[in-house]
Amino acid sequence: MPKFVIDVMLKPDIHDPQGEAIARACRRLGFGQVTGVRQGKRFEIELTEPAPQERIAELAAELLANPVIEEFFIEPG
């Protein structure tokens, strides 16, 4: 069964308050070497038959990511 992994992340220039909160919590817990965290989403998509990566990119752009503030990366699963 074909599978794709799609990671959706905020674009680098978009403020990530959740990532900043996690980084602060890491330092509070004694992980002082943590200087930054970016929070994102991961989707594992299973298909009944093969599909071109361009089609999977359409799915990600139209349904999984907000193209104004997020970018996505696709890998075969």
Show where each model-derived region lies.
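Non-catalytic terminal accessory/regulatory regions of metabolic enzymes
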Residues: 1-77
